[in-house]
């Protein structure tokens, strides 16, 4: 029997599915069994790598999955989470009907959850929305969205809120993970997202990881780095972190530094480049300009907090014109001696790192994730790494550049590109720019002035506004913020449970968030709907619906579009707007936003033969194509070009900008980027002068440090087996068994000093709350003395009852990596 590589992989998947079900299939029957399974492509539901998978369905269920051998990203590989994708949808507690807190048949905030119809749920929601609008205006209602939503779900949320409700109170959970990176991209280059791609891995001479445990968080990319390192003895890997983790196993240089001092380390590197004449002056003079950042900018806490007094919080994001000489003066104090004392790194470690960046013959890729972004100076550290690459000219060329890795499957595609933030519109447009608002109103066919110029509330501000009674309704979709967000006990939970407030959670499972809400809406997930994600390398990937959702569960897209029918323009818009377009009087928001002659212009006949598509069948037109083509109009011709819709179903994803059917691997470089003209060489065309910004900023301390009472640093993060709050992975028996509960990792000598031993039940406390857990002094994570590490996947151990809601004042992203705690034996 002759089998192609693809058929062989599918046969393996069929065998794996049978094994998981406890069955045995004779070898001769494997291919026959595979022939009974229907296969189609999809994208992994987990991290931002964007691995492509083959999904096998039979009898209306997903029964197998396999890494797609034809995919450029993962080349047939999956990580351990990816291999168990079929099981994420079939947890025993899957939600199948709307649930509302009720007593005697009526809504009661303190009542028990009871099943209701979708119409009853939406009528209740609409009543609460309208009450809130009447009480506190357009900003009384908020949406907390997700980098896990599909592109069209994110676009529909944005459109319903910003055009329909005329409120910019939309924020994604990417606020917790990618906001600092996005803001730094915009400030440095005038455009968001990385200039390079994963192809850099096979061409780089050195990799430097800053606050990134790629071995566990991006294991498929790590496998490619490992292959590059092992295949070429001259390639080097450097890992910087505040504790030792599995990525250190491959590292040639493992550097453990004191929290927050990455700011000082990078300023030392810049100082080294200057002192050793390692500046690429030709590049710097042609392609960069110098700015100085505002300092003493605070920590994003409530205004009355002592740390916010006498700060420049109001002008935190301001950048002042500057010069190379001013940068040179600022970094001159960051000597190797001073930074060694600050960071805990020895002089040789620091100099070796600086020499790597200084060597003009070495191609260097810098990777980072949450260690940089979840930081009270996250925008600064992002911009400092850009400084290093810009000063050396090591940017926008194969094998060389700074690369921000994303943690969610569409943090780029849905949160950032779609503009699902309270200050953004699609394709890097912003609500504060009149021309950008006019563009949105033109594309959306709206009266002038519909889109508000007022920036909405970010998620931490939403928490505080709910707690203060200034925002009264919150709809949370596709995330679990009651478990994942900071300072649960003091801000979020009191606001959600406050009398007069109403919280809706759309989710497939009864998460901590869902059980804290007033209304739970059961949601279709992954291949139960047609989808699109945008990964970390600007690659947009599509998949088709392959099975139906259970019971009455509906996709978030259906929920948004159907809910729009419960509001009219007369209720939501001003007389001035209706006078401009009287044809919209009395129309529902659904009719104006979604059945507008653009979104609804593609008939059902354009669906592939036999293709499932519940939303399109319900609404009577190819919803996803209409939404995508309208959305794509924002970016085409402006450096954010997306390909025509149909191309994506044929390809394994395309990296934008896609011009004349050709994707772009390296942006801003002549010969690779169609927006760089002949003879320009490099053009950072996000700015009119096509120059990137080199920003001078100093070290500033964290919001909270250990003291006599709370004597340890706490850093939070993840482990390989689980993803975020474990909503999906803890319902996969194999993953749950592999890592059933959260732990707290501590240095053995710190444990000994407290009379603790490995395996002890402990209580970890901060100024905000406490958590009971178990101690690990021998495991995969090895903190230095003075620091403990824990995860947040375990709903039975709410690690974010400990964390501080301090944020970067520019990006508003929370610092989950640094707060002060104490650890003692539990009673």
From Swiss-Prot:
Gene name of the record: napA
Alphabetized SMART domains for the sequence: Molybdop_Fe4S4
Domain 4Fe-4S Mo/W bis-MGD-type: 37-93
Signal peptide: 1-33
Record protein name field: Periplasmic nitrate reductase
Binding positions for Mo-bis(molybdopterin guanine dinucleotide) per the UniProt entry: 81, 148, 173, 177, 210-217, 241-245, 260-262, 370, 374, 480, 506-507, 529, 556, 716-725, 800, 817
MF-aspect GO terms: 4 iron, 4 sulfur cluster binding; electron transfer activity; iron ion binding; molybdenum ion binding; molybdopterin cofactor binding; nitrate reductase (cytochrome) activity
Its job: Catalytic subunit of the periplasmic nitrate reductase complex NapAB. Receives electrons from NapB and catalyzes the reduction of nitrate to nitrite.
Pfam families xref list: Molybdop_Fe4S4 (PF04879), Molybdopterin (PF00384), Molydop_binding (PF01568)
Cofactor: [4Fe-4S] cluster; Mo-bis(molybdopterin guanine dinucleotide)
Post-translational modification: Predicted to be exported by the Tat system. The position of the signal peptide cleavage has not been experimentally proven.
């Amino acid at each position: 029997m002759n089998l192609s590589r693809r058929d062989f992989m599918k046969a393996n998947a069929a065998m794996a599915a049978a094994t998981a079900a406890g069955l045995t299939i004779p070898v001769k029957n494997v291919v026959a069994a595979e022939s009974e399974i229907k296969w189609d492509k999809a994208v992994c539901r987990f991290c931002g790598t964007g691995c492509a998978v083959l999904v096998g369905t039979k009898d209306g269920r997903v029964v197998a999955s396999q890494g797609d051998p034809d995919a450029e990203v993962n080349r047939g590989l999956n990580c351990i989470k990816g291999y168990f994708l079929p099981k994420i949808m079939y947890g025993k507690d899957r939600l199948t009907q709307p649930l509302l807190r009720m007593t005697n048949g009526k809504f009661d905030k303190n009542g028990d959850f009871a099943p209701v119809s979708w119409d009853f749920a939406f009528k209740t929601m609409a009543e609460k929305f309208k009450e809130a609008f009447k009480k506190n205006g357009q900003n009384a209602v908020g949406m907390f969205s997700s980098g896990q939503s599909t592109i069209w779900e994110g676009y529909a949320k944005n459109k319903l809120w910003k055009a329909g409700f005329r409120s910019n109170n939309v924020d994604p959970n990417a606020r917790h993970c990618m906001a600092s990176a996005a803001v730094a991209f915009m400030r440095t280059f005038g455009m968001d997202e990385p200039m390079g791609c994963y192809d850099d891995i096979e061409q780089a001479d050195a990799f430097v990881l800053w606050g990134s445990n790629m071995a566990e968080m991006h294991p498929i990319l790590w496998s490619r780095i490992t292959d590059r390192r092992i295949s070429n003895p001259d390639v080097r890997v450097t890992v910087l972190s505040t504790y030792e983790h599995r990525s250190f196993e491959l590292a040639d240089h493992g550097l453990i530094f004191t929290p927050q001092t990455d700011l000082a380390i990078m300023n030392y590197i810049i100082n080294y480049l200057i002192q050793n004449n390692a500046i690429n002056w030709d590049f710097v003079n042609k392609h960069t300009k110098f700015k100085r950042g505002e300092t003493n900018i605070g920590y994003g806490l409530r205004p009355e907090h002592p740390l916010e007094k006498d700060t420049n919080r109001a002008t935190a994001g301001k950048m002042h014109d500057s010069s190379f000489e001013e940068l040179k003066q600022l970094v001159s104090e960051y000597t190797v001696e001073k930074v060694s004392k600050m960071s805990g790194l020895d002089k040789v470690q620091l100099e070796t790192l600086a020499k790597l960046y200084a060597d003009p013959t070495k191609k260097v890729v810098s990777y980072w994730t949450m260690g940089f972004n979840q930081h009270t100076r996250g925008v600064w550290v992002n911009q400092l790494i850009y400084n290093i690459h810009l000063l050396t000219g090591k940017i926008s060329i194969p094998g060389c550049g700074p690369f921000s890795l994303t943690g969610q499957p569409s943090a780029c595609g849905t949160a950032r590109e779609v503009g699902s933030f309270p200050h953004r519109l699609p394709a890097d447009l912003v609500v504060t720019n009149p021309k950008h608002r006019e563009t949105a109103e033109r594309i959306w066919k709206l009266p002038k002035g519909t889109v508000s110029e007022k920036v909405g509330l970010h998620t931490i501000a939403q928490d505080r506004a709910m707690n203060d009674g200034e925002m009264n309704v919150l709809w949370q979709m596709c995330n679990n913020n009651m478990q994942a967000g900071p300072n649960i006990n003091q801000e979020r939970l009191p606001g959600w449970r406050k009398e007069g407030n109403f919280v809706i959670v759309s989710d497939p499972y009864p998460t901590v968030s869902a059980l804290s809400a007033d209304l739970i809406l059961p949601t279709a997930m992954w291949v139960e709907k047609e989808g699109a994600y945008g990964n970390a390398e600007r690659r947009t990937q599509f998949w088709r619906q392959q099975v139906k959702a259970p019971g009455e569960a509906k996709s978030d897209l259906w929920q948004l579009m159907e809910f729009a029918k419960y509001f009219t323009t007369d209720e939501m818009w001003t007389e001035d707007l209706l006078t401009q377009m009287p044809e919209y009087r009395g129309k529902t928001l659904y009719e104006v936003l979604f059945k507008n002659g653009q979104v609804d212009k593609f008939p059902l006949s354009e669906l592939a033969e036999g293709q499932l598509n519940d939303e399109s069948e319900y609404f009577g037109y190819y919803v996803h194509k209409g939404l995508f083509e309208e959305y794509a109009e924002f970016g085409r011709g402006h450096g954010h070009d997306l390909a025509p819709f149909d191309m994506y179903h044929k390809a394994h994803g395309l990296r934008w900008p896609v011009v004349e059917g050709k994707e772009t691997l390296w942006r801003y470089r002549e010969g690779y980027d169609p927006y760089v003209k002949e003879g320009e060489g490099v053009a950072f065309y996000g700015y009119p002068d096509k120059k990137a910004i080199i920003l001078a900023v100093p070290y500033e301390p964290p919001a909270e440090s250990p003291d006599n009472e709370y004597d340890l640093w706490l850093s939070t993060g993840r482990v390989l087996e689980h993803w975020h709050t474990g909503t999906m992975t803890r319902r996969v028996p194999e993953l749950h068994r592999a890592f059933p509960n959260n732990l707290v990792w501590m240095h053995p000598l710190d444990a000994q000093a407290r009379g603790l031993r490995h395996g002890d039940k402990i209580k970890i406390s901060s100024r905000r709350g406490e958590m009971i857990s178990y101690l690990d002094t021998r495991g995969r994570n090895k903190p230095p003395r003075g620091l403990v590490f824990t995860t947040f996947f375990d709903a039975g151990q709410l690690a974010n009852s400990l964390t501080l809601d301090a944020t970067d004042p520019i990006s508003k992203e929370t610092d989950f990596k640094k707060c002060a705690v104490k650890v003692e034996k539990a009673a």
